[in-house]
């Protein structure tokens, strides 16, 4: 309580809620455990390959030796069948968690579903993330089924906004 009050005593600081945190996270392309990464999603599928240290990778000093190492290391070598991608729906309607993603605007096959999505205030439109087949590239079009209608969605690079911080 005392710490929060100290922070809020600065007029440049304002309290925010989970909605603000979530929109910032989405725009930054950061995954949320339980949505974009689960026990059924590997680090390679979640685009988190950087989290596996070089010494634990194939050929590293202490290669493998962690739960799921065989699968994870094979996928890091280029074998992931699906990956987390950014999506930019056309129009203003956000696509949210659970919305089906299809490979065609009519008929076609469901190829995944949105794991996180919402409105991105900094980009001025809806943004989303989904785990989809690995062959998709930025600029490719897929379709989201929203309220019984399929809308075009463009696969996009993440983060949706370019960071302006210094490393």
Placement of each model-derived feature along the sequence:
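Conserved, structured C-terminal
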Residues: 1-167
């Amino acid at each position: 309580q005392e710490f929060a009050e100290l922070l809020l005593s600065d007029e440049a600081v304002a309290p925010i809620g989970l909605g603000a945190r979530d929109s910032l996270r989405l725009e930054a392309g950061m995954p949320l455990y339980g949505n974009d990464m689960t026990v059924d999603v590997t680090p390679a599928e979640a685009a988190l390959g950087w989290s596996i240290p070089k010494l634990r990778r194939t050929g590293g000093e202490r290669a493998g030796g962690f739960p799921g190492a065989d699968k994870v290391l094979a996928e890091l070598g280029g074998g992931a069948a699906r990956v987390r991608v950014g999506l930019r729906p056309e129009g203003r309607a956000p696509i949210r968690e659970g919305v089906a993603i299809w490979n065609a605007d009519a008929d076609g096959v469901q190829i995944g579903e949105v794991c996180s999505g919402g409105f991105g205030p900094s980009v001025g439109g809806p943004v989303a993330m989904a785990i989809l087949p690995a062959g998709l590239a930025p600029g490719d079009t897929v379709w989201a089924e929203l309220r019984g209608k399929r809308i075009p969605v463009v696969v996009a690079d993440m983060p949706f906004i370019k960071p302006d911080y210094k490393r």
